[in-house]
């Protein structure tokens, strides 16, 4: 702070943590809360537990701001959002009440059932334990997170025929995926329905085009993908850890290139995972997952569609029973999707966000 000259104003940035998204608002005009000498003796973050929903107030110093506005760097915003997400995860109690059918949310027990099903049917996925300090007591010690490793990526998301849309309408997945100021139960729900209505045919066409595009050695990347359980949103949460052709960890900025632009800009965070120490990963924020899953399940029931994975080529799984090399996936035995089949549909959903990651690899890649 000694490096700065001139007048100092303190701004409050309000981080409103809701069940739907994290909203960042600047409060104007600035409020002179603390004099410079007293800043170091006061906490920089306050949390008011009496608020519902919880609200964080973060003090940010701003110098020489005659227009009484301050602009936070994009990376700062990402870290603020990640910090808010981590705090919300820590503070939210675990729910064991099943609302799978009505909300699209699942309990920890249902997450384990869905993970067992995924591992049994698609053996490129496996359960893993967590770092000692990160063990979550509401999950079995050896089933803290699901992981699949060495998933190749040869093209960046922006080169897969531009923004990925999943329906025939103008508004597709990309506009839905942004956590903005829309009413969470209004326009977004209609857009989710468009996604669920589609058979992901356009996504498959894009994948075929991408496969024909020449890729150089420098384009090749590999990913370890992790599915953890989010207590704050009561849904699975996807973490990505990428590596260069030389095996060096990718920076968050590099990994952003493999997530569709409209999604990465608003609902992707850089954070320490809930299951591992001393590492930073990119996480796909789960604020919309429950709504997507609920609508997808409703569409499965309405159509009586027995094949919940029809038309999806890139899910990071290899079926142990698939001997013909075709994209034949587990069928739903009844018109209603079972809770243990939840993660298969979840991965169908995630595949649209990371179209450049080639999940259709074989066991020989391990």
UniProtKB/Swiss-Prot annotation:
Q: Where in the cell is it found?
A: Cytoplasm
**InterPro entries noted in UniProt:** Atg3/Atg10
Region annotated Flexible region sits at 160-217
- Which GO cellular component term is one of those annotated? phagophore
Residue segments, region Handle region = 291-341
Per the UniProt record, one Pfam family is: Autophagy_act_C
The UniProt record lists the keyword Protein transport: yes
Q: Name one GO molecular function term.
A: Atg8-family ligase activity
Alphabetically sorted, this entry's keywords are: Autophagy, Cytoplasm, Protein transport, Transport, Ubl conjugation pathway
Q: Is the keyword Nucleotide-binding in the record?
A: no
Which intervals of the chain form a coiled coil?
none
Q: Name one GO biological process term.
A: protein targeting to membrane
Active-site residues are: 287 (glycyl thioester intermediate)
Which proteins does it associate with, and in what oligomeric form?
Monomer. Interacts with ATG8 through an intermediate thioester bond through the C-terminal Gly of ATG8. Also interacts with the 40 amino acid C-terminal region of the E1-like ATG7 enzyme. Also interacts with the ATG12-ATG5 conjugate.
Summarizing the function annotation, the protein's role is: E2 conjugating enzyme required for the cytoplasm to vacuole transport (Cvt) and autophagy. Required for selective autophagic degradation of the nucleus (nucleophagy) as well as for mitophagy which contributes to regulate mitochondrial quantity and quality by eliminating the mitochondria to a basal level to fulfill cellular energy requirements and preventing excess ROS production. Responsible for the E2-like covalent binding of phosphatidylethanolamine to the C-terminal Gly of ATG8.
Quote the entry's note on domains: The N-terminal region is involved in phosphatidylethanolamine-binding and is required for ATG8-PE conjugation.
Q: Which family does it belong to?
A: Belongs to the ATG3 family.
Q: What is this protein called?
A: Autophagy-related protein 3
Please report the organism this UniProt entry assigns to the protein: Yarrowia lipolytica (strain CLIB 122 / E 150)
Taxonomic lineage of the native organism: Eukaryota, Fungi, Dikarya, Ascomycota, Saccharomycotina
């Amino acid at each position: 702070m000694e490096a700065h000259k001139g007048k100092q104003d303190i701004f409050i940035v309000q981080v409103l943590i809701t069940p739907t998204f994290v909203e960042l608002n600047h409060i104007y005009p600035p409020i002179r809360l603390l004099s410079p000498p007293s800043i170091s003796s006061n906490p920089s973050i306050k949390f008011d537990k009496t608020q519902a929903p919880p609200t964080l107030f973060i003090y940010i110093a701003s110098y020489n701001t005659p227009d009484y506005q301050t602009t936070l760097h994009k990376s700062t915003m990402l870290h603020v959002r990640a910090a808010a997400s981590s705090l919300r995860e820590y503070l939210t109690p675990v729910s064991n009440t099943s609302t799978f059918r009505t909300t699209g949310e699942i309990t920890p027990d249902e997450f384990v059932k869905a993970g067992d099903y995924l591992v049994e049917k698609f053996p490129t996925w496996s359960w893993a334990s967590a770092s000692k300090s990160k063990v979550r007591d509401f999950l079995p010690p050896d089933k803290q997170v699901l992981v699949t490793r060495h998933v190749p990526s040869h093209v960046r998301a922006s080169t897969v025929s531009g923004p990925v849309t999943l329906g025939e309408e103008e508004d597709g997945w990309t506009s839905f995926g942004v956590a903005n100021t829309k009413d969470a139960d209004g326009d977004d729900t209609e857009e989710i329905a468009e996604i669920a209505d589609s058979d992901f045919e356009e996504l498959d066409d894009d994948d075929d085009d991408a496969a024909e595009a020449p890729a150089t050695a420098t384009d090749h990347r590999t990913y370890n993908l992790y599915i953890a359980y989010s207590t704050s949103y009561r849904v699975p949460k996807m973490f990505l850890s990428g590596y260069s052709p030389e095996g060096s960890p990718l920076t968050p900025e590099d990994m952003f290139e493999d997530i569709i632009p409209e999604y990465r800009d608003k609902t992707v965070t850089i954070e320490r995972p809930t299951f591992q120490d001393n590492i930073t990963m990119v996480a796909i924020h789960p604020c919309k997952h429950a709504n997507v899953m609920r609508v997808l399940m409703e569409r499965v029931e309405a159509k009586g569609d027995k094949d919940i994975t029809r038309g999806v080529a890139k899910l990071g799984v290899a079926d142990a029973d698939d001997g013909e090399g075709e994209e034949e996936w587990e069928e739903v035995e009844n018109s209603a999707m079972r809770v243990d089949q939840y993660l298969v549909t979840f991965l169908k959903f995630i595949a649209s966000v990371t179209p450049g990651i080639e999940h259709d690899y074989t066991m020989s890649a391990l």
